[in-house]
Amino acid sequence: MSRIAFAAMTAVAAGVAFAFLLLPLVAIFLRVPLGDLLDQFGNQVFRDALVVSLKTSLIAHVAVLLFGTPTAYLIARKRFFGRGALITLIELPLVLPPAVAGIALLAAFGRLGLLGDELDALGISIGFTQTAVILAVAFVESPFYVRGAIASFESVDPDLIAAARTLGAGPWRVFGRVALPLAAGGLGAASALALARGLGEFGATIIFAGSLQGVTQTLPLAIYAQLEQDFDVALAISALFVLVGAAILVSLKVFAWARHGSISPFRFAASTSR
């Protein structure tokens, strides 16, 4: 194949791929006048869903960071029997359909679930509450963060860890003053990607928490609900969600460029595993 033919073929393939990815997003904004977009800030459905999304996503994300960071550090620093199986288990939610995740959460924490009687005895009801939303979001986003955090901690030079221990630093000091700062770039990228995934969660949430406005209805659920009632409102909320996602991605790119001179957060996150 000649060089010109190859260049033409790759250009056509790239053009088709780019058009396929861009066209649906452009179509949303072509259907939504700016006035309708701004009007959504006065829409009670949108405001309630935004509050629920931000509240539950932030709580879930903080929990993922608090529990996921030490877990990732342990897995990255230690070599033990079953380590590979444990990592595979952590990654398993990545390949599960969201509906399966929701049913699994119901089977574990629902009223008739594995822990249902114990929770009921304590007067705790999780299913179809904001707590259920938080658990659903944490379940689907945690593999994104933990897997990226493991790679980030693995990228830290073991000699620096050993040197800190030789100088008398205890495990807490080594973790907080050496490992965390050196892995901060990758941890930040993994955190942002996990947060974005959590904000977009739909399937597990609607099955485990339902879609009650002002209580468990997040932005993705509000879009789905409005789709059956007012397509224009669903389009406007979708456009706002695209803008939120774009803002997160741009922030990632700026952060990655500032830290590593790369505009790709995915390349940046991958570089931490080397």
Task: Locate the predicted segments by residue.
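Periplasmic/extracellular loop-to-transmembrane helix junction in inner-membrane transport proteins
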Residues: 2-8, 26-62, 74-78, 225-231
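Interhelical loop and adjacent transmembrane-helix boundary motif
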Residues: 2-6, 37, 44, 205-251, ...
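Cytoplasmic-entry segments and transmembrane alpha-helices of multi-pass inner-membrane transporters
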Residues: 7, 11, 74-105, 161, ...
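Transmembrane alpha-helices
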Residues: 11-18, 92, 139-141, 145-157, ...
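Hydrophobic alpha-helical transmembrane segments of multipass integral membrane proteins
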Residues: 51, 55-67, 71, 97, ...
